[in-house]
Amino acid sequence: MSTNYAYTHGASSIPLLGETIDENLKKTVEKYPDQEALICAHQNYRATYREFYEQVIQVAKGLIALGVKRGDRVGVWSPNCYQWTLLQYATAKIGAILVNINPAYRTSELIYVINQSGLSVMFSALQFKSSNYKKMMDDAREFTDTIRKTIFWDKSWDHFLKEGERISDETLRKREGKVQFDDPVNIQYTSGTTGNPKGVTLSHHNILNNAYFIGIRMNYSHVDRVCIPVPFYHCFGMVIGNLACTVHGATMVIPNDSFDPVKTLETIERERCTSLYGVPTMFIAELQEMEQKTYDLSSLRTGVMAGSLCPPEIMKKVKEQMNMHEITICYGMTETSPVSTQTKIGAPFEKQIYSVGTIHDHLEIKIIDPETKATLKRGESGELCTRGYSVMLKYWNSPDATHQVLDEQRWMHTGDLAMMDEEGYLHISGRIKDLIIRGGENISPKEIEDFLYTYKGVMDAQVIGVPSEKYGEEIMAWIKPKEGVTITEEEIRDFCKDRIAHYKIPKYWKFVSEFPMTISGKIRKVEMREIAARELGLEPED
């Protein structure tokens, strides 16, 4: 195909890794046994690669003792902690599938994920912020029937490890010997435009190789110490974070159970971190904190900004004020393990700031006309498609949803509007789908709309994203009350509280008697966004 077309592939002299996550981790342990593997500052936890792997083995044996078989789904519902990381590698070791559960989920969302994935074992924190996980698990039991055992981060965790002591090394070796690199290893639930979250199913091959090439692009080695304040339940934390470290022998440094700019900066200073991750809002908070207090960030070199569109002005400040001269921007999605393109160290400054980089090794991308599906020319805007080793296996137990995004040629249709320039750099300009991205969180309008319908006075509800300087987008709900019914913003907010995750509760509300409609009777969300932006004094979307 002519280079005039918006198509490119990541030709590479570096071969893909044809091994499981555990096989790869063993190599790192053998090479760097005394190198620090994991530091969890908020738990006063430290482990070298030798110590870390010994604990992974303990957890793996505990899972076998619980009766976890190859292919069984094991849930983890917790903020960042060392136990989460041990489970990530232990489930991979024995061929189980780790199911990441968003710590902000409430009972109804938890029930859906348990039933949809068929979880057999759940690991969970007891409580975090306003979430009482133990109570929600108790409330969920009558609506689920697949979970055999729930283990919390308390004495039951200690007992779980103790039970694993009766499993022999030989039993463990037999189990790990059956694991194949194309086996599913992880299910991550991500919101789309069609309602309930979908279970993105990823293999060892998917995420191990993506982590490998992310690290190569950032020049990672065993001397790097990577500060990971982003959540593990996202690919950002567990793949770009944890896996990219272990595949290159670097150190995972976890500053806190959730993001805190002060603790993050203090941890970088104390642990001499060389790399820092975050969504744009995290970097904005860190820059604001640095105006109040001086931190020694001289050890920083690189990092990743991703999760939502990265404002060029913020990128400039991070490079200049945080000493992150080699920071990279990543673009991707959970369905692609997650990174498809990434800026390169040493690329022209403008390309590092105003694009999302170039294609990763061994992957392909193209820009197509959303209607005709024809490949467009460079410089033209259309839908971005990705193909290659990184594309997910499927949406768990959702063949129809899978076929909607994965075509016969295995192209992943992202729903994102993008443009490829003459040099092959990718520029993201928006989305075809109505998906809202608030501070890096994917939020389905339909999921919130369906929930709002359950409120007694609501006749109709429509949810849109409106521009936000801080989060990229905020949620706005337009409510059409039933005839003769008056609904206040306060009462419907109270209804949402503790029933859906806090980040899904709309910030803006508008009560209407009608919605803007097309002649054929379809609701015009484009016009709704224009009206909202005008009334709220916000910039309308392009």
Where in the sequence are the language-model features?
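Gly/Ser/Thr-rich phosphate-binding loop
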Residues: 250, 270-278, 287-351, 364
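Structural core segment of the AMP-binding/adenylate-forming
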Residues: 93-163, 483
